């Protein structure tokens, strides 16, 4: 009985070791299949390989920069330019080199042979660098669109220099301020004096036909206007004396 038990245990152990040995290659090959599926998301739609210097069109398709540059260059140099000018290879929508959006990442420390061949091909055909992002092309306009105060500063730097510099507030600016204050006081005073002169000389429709208590109200309004006009005149005289 004991001998049969040891024989069965040894056979079962050998069977288990063989099963584990058979299953080990499957465990090692599973991540490679996942990596292949992940790399498929970044394949160029022209060469069907992993995108080198990837760029994305506004219609949402991924390409290698050398591939899409050659595609656009061949279209522009072809005879039938009017029929196929700047069309996306996938959806045939209009695209331009300036509208391409580059993608950046960590990159690969040891590029593969396909990447090396693409680089050599790009150098041989004198393919330029892929276009920079729109934020780097026009930094002043993009920053001004995000910050309106920066746009105002670029449009009127002299105003900001006078505003923030300690010596910017000169006598000319003080006289301009005094003139502005005087005119702000003069305009309502002139208007009130004109109304008073017009009502006293020509009268109004309400004064001739209205009831006595309305005439009393008009007299009170005239008195208050006279007092306000005297106050404004005093303020104007003080401004002239001070400035």
UniProtKB/Swiss-Prot annotation:
Catalytic activity: S-ubiquitinyl-[E2 ubiquitin-conjugating enzyme]-L-cysteine + [acceptor protein]-L-lysine = [E2 ubiquitin-conjugating enzyme]-L-cysteine + N(6)-ubiquitinyl-[acceptor protein]-L-lysine
Biochemical pathway: Protein modification; protein ubiquitination
Effects seen without this gene: No visible phenotype and no effect on drought stress response, probably due to the redundancy with RMA1 and RMA2.
Tissue: Ubiquitous. Highly expressed in roots.
GO MF entries: ubiquitin protein ligase activity; ubiquitin-protein transferase activity; zinc ion binding
One Gene Ontology CC term in the entry: endoplasmic reticulum
Any Pfam family matching the protein: zf-C3HC4
TM region(s), chain numbering: 223-243
Main location: endoplasmic reticulum
Record annotation: effect of changing residue 59 to S: Strong reduction of ubiquitin ligase activity
Renumbered residue ranges of the record's region Disordered: 110-135
UniProt cross-references to InterPro entries, sorted A to Z: RNF5/RNF185-like, Znf_C3HC4_RING-type, Znf_RING, Znf_RING/FYVE/PHD, Znf_RING_CS
Topology class, membrane: Single-pass type IV membrane protein
Keywords: Endoplasmic reticulum, Membrane, Metal-binding, Transferase, Transmembrane, Transmembrane helix, Ubl conjugation pathway, Zinc, Zinc-finger
Enzyme Commission identifier(s): 2.3.2.27
PROSITE patterns: ZF_RING_1, ZF_RING_2
Location in or out of the cell: Endoplasmic reticulum membrane
Name of the protein described by the UniProt record: E3 ubiquitin-protein ligase RMA3
UniProt source species: Arabidopsis thaliana
The organism's taxonomic lineage, starting at the top: Eukaryota, Viridiplantae, Streptophyta, Embryophyta, Tracheophyta
Record gene name: RMA3
